[in-house]
Amino acid sequence: LYTCALCTKIGRYGIISNNVLQKGKGRSTVSEFSVSLAKLAEEANLTTAYTPCELDKIQVTATEVYRPGILLAGYYENFDNKRIQIIGLTEMSYLDELSTSLRNTHLEKLFSFQPPAVVLTRGMRPMSEMMQYAKQYGVPLLMSTEMTSALMGQLITTLNTELAPRITRHGVLVEVYGEGILILGDSGVGKSETAIELVKRGHRLIADDAVELRRVSYRKILGTAPANI
């Protein structure tokens, strides 16, 4: 039995943290995996102000989101256009104070980078210029009623889970007293039988035979059954 320290508990998943997953320790902000913008919008309860196509056709690969305050001030260096852009009350207030010409310049620059989406928080409606440049450059423009920090936290959590580096191991994953336990061993040594005995005692079976492990952060590994099994 390999007992893994509990980090947290998310729904039907068992959460484990150990050195079982070696890949992904130095992962960059861009993942080899992707998640559809439609799934992110559903998870975060986002509404659509404009989209050039169905949201499920747009894939997001960056594990972070970005508030483009410094870009709207005219600094464009090192801008990562793979991140979802979040515009909160601070950015909107700043844009309101700019002259029409300067506001158009900075907004056009933002949308010309063609990020996966631009999201307005706190129930704010997009400016007419935002709609204009969203249509011109084909950038989805979404809205949320959440506070900016709350929405960013939710999106980052979802992105870290969906885009996490992952491997599949032969074994059985159970949850015992809230802790994820990964049972490893050769075929026929009794992994499934051990899991059955634990289930009889009121514990939960998470995955049998094949276990998908995702490193959702540097200290957490998420274990679940592979989606295609």
Regions found by a protein language model. Give the residues of each.
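Short, positively charged and aromatic/hydrophobic N-terminal segments
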Residues: 2-19
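Gly/Thr-rich phosphate-binding loop signature of adenosyl cofactor/nucleotide-binding cores
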Residues: 26-111
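Structural motif
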Residues: 83-86, 116-119, 139-142, 180-182, ...
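Short, surface-exposed connector motifs at secondary-structure boundaries
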Residues: 110-116, 135-138
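Charged, amphipathic alpha-helical linker segments immediately N-terminal to NTP-binding catalytic cores
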Residues: 125-158
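P-loop NTPase nucleotide-binding/switch module
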Residues: 158-178
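Glycine-rich phosphate-binding P-loop
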Residues: 179-200, 204-205
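Conserved nucleotide-sensing/catalytic segment adjacent to the nucleotide-binding pocket
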Residues: 207, 214-229
